[in-house]
Amino acid sequence: MSRPIFKVHKGDRITFQQRLQDGYVCLDQFIPLLTNLSSFNFHRDDPLVENLDDMVTSQFNILIDTDRSGTRWITLQKAHELWDLLQIKDDSGSENLTDHDDDNEANHNGVEDDGQKTPENNGRKTDNHTMENGGTENTNNGNNSSNKNDGNVTAEGSNFRPATITNGTTSRISGGEPDTVKHELLDLPDSPTKRHQTKSVSKIPVFQHDLPTVSTLQKTLPPVSNYSNDERAKLETLLQRILFPETTNLNVAEGYPSVSLTQQVQELDTQFPNVPLNFNIPIDEHGNTSLHWLCSIANLDLLKQLIVFGSDRRIGDKSGESVLVKSVKSVNNYDSGTFEILLDYLYPCIVMVDDMDRTVLHHIVITSGMPGCNAAAKYYLDILMGWIVKKQSRTKESHCVLLEDIDLQWVITHLLNARDSNGDTCLNIAARLGNVAIVEALLDYGADPNIANNSGLCPVDFGAGTQPRFQSNTKNLMATPTKTHETSLDPMAESTSLITNIKSLLSKISNDYGDEIKQHNGKMKELLDTLNIKREALANARDRLAKAKQIQDEYNLLSDRLNNVENTIAEEDQNFQLASRELGLSLDDVQEEGLNSADIAFDADEPFRISYVYTKFEEKIKDEYNNDFELFLKHCNLSQLVHEIYDNFPSRAEIPHPKILKARIKAYNRNELHLDSTLQTIIPHPKILKARIKAYNRNELHLDSTLQTIKDKQKNLESKFRKVLSLCLKIDEEKVDSMLDGLLQAISNEDPEDIDTDEVNNFLESAAE
């Protein structure tokens, strides 16, 4: 959103566009005029000149801010310089919304007479979110009255403005009329500073309970950790009552409920007797205290009361961020215009740094890089520097050493060029973010663009401070030990210095890169060695795994074979029992014959075995050949062994005559007598012999039947094969048998792929004929 500014140049009326959000002026109307004024002898439409605009802006040292639509904008300060250079005057016949006509500006944008925008028609969308707490919607922009002196604040009857740097010197404000300066904090016609001017109290309140002992940069105090649950419960109950009271009475000045903290504390003392009220207890997981939250939401009324009740302003959160840092990380104080009054109560936090050694200026610059926070950050920066200047006329009766020490000289010496843990100054961060307005403001306030961070990068490397008006500062700023650098206005000297700086920077980067490459190569070598070792170990592990899998497979195979053998043995035993029953060797038959089950131990060779001879053979193999039957067959003389056994056979007198033996067997069968011991050792029991004979007969019948079945199957199969061949060869079945030998010879070969098909075909053709 922009508004017109009407100007007159050589009798012609020119309309310039000014952006409402930050007061920047569109550059497009300046380019033709500056081209005519420049030293370039080219026509604007000359095809040889493609970058004429860049050449013009470079000649006149113009920093450009390009928005998303491609429109180029410059600061209002630079626009005034160009208007003066081009001798462009205001159009007296129109209403210009410039810094010389604030009343018309207010009427044009829906601003009330007191300088504040009405909530119904405020002319802009407020981005009221915080960086940490998510933010809340705020419909009140505050109604603190503002002066109508074009941003000049009256102090002791005289107008004064914040100190700025002009032509290398510092204009210090000490109560008198200031020198003419180019960068003014409160003179932008539509700046947040003018929209949100607030009335500061004439005297800065001083609370001695938490003032820093020295006026040098120091760390914030860590969050309180030694507290009881009752203390925390009491504080949370109090915050619930004061932030969300049951009554609906609002503080008209700030838009928050008006609550008496003293009354609430008295009521809580009756509810929590003997429990002290500690306002410094953290109330969230980030270590934020009540002051942190109140600063973030811009609730000044409760903030003042908490400080009166003894809240410590030096305590930071878990990151070391002070309550003042929380206030600049939110846009609520910008929307309500309460930041200047807030500084009257939080000035001890100006000397505080967080765990990364970052000051409040660092955080203001970082906030400027957040979406929708650029204008708020610029407002915080201008108000802070303006407060530093104006407080010099307000601290005469305060009798506070800290307030007396914190002046503009102290800010430039200790705060403006302070470096964080990375070596970055606030100007270095702003230059990297590319925030032109913040960079120019910091340079005007006296920031040094040549201070390098830990990586060797300076703000100058990002284009900050390269304009001649910043390079002409060759003296110490305000007689302080702040480091300055002489810069010649000679373009050749400037180019030589810039080339030297670039060479040194490239050399340092090259050295750092070489060191990093060496370290990287060393680490890579170590990693490769480790990788090779791991690869060998992996290969060995894979080999072991393969062997283990092979052994496991073999084990599984052997287990399967063993199971198969056992199953086969069990099956054969079962079949043997069935066959034994069929052959008359079952246990039932033995029991019918009056024998025990041990008597039916089956031995197929037993009917053909002579126990005496068999015993002699066993003794011979065992005693002389150590049970090695192959060795026995190789070295033993069987004929000699047979003669020995025959010679040593028991005497024939011990064996009865065959007739006598038959008579005894008959008598034995009639149970008339028992066989003597000699016959019992030679001839089995007659019943066993009968059972065996019966079994052999049955077995022979079974074998004959099986043989006949096989023969029948074979004949049937041969008949089928003969029929198949006859059909294939197209001959009679009777001729197949006579042709089998020739056909077999034709197709027989070791390799089936090398079968001589021609020979087979010839044979088949001859057979068909």
Swiss-Prot record:
Q: Return one GO MF term.
A: transcription coactivator activity
> Which keywords does the record carry?
Activator, ANK repeat, DNA-binding, Repeat, Transcription, Transcription regulation
Write out the biased-composition intervals (Polar residues). 164-173
Q: Which domain of life is it from?
A: Eukaryota
Task: List GO BP terms, alphabetically.
Answer: positive regulation of transcription by RNA polymerase II
Q: Compositionally biased, Low complexity: which spans?
A: 132-152
Transmembrane segment boundaries: none
Tell me the ranges holding the ANK repeats. Answer: 286-315, 422-451
Q: Which Pfam families match?
A: Ank (PF00023), Swi6_N (PF18530)
Describe the protein's quaternary organization and the partners it interacts with: MBF contains SWI6 and MBP1; SBF contains SWI6 and SWI4.
Protein name, entry field: Regulatory protein SWI6
Give the source species. Kluyveromyces lactis (strain ATCC 8585 / CBS 2359 / DSM 70799 / NBRC 1267 / NRRL Y-1140 / WM37) (Yeast)
Q: Which gene underlies this protein?
A: SWI6
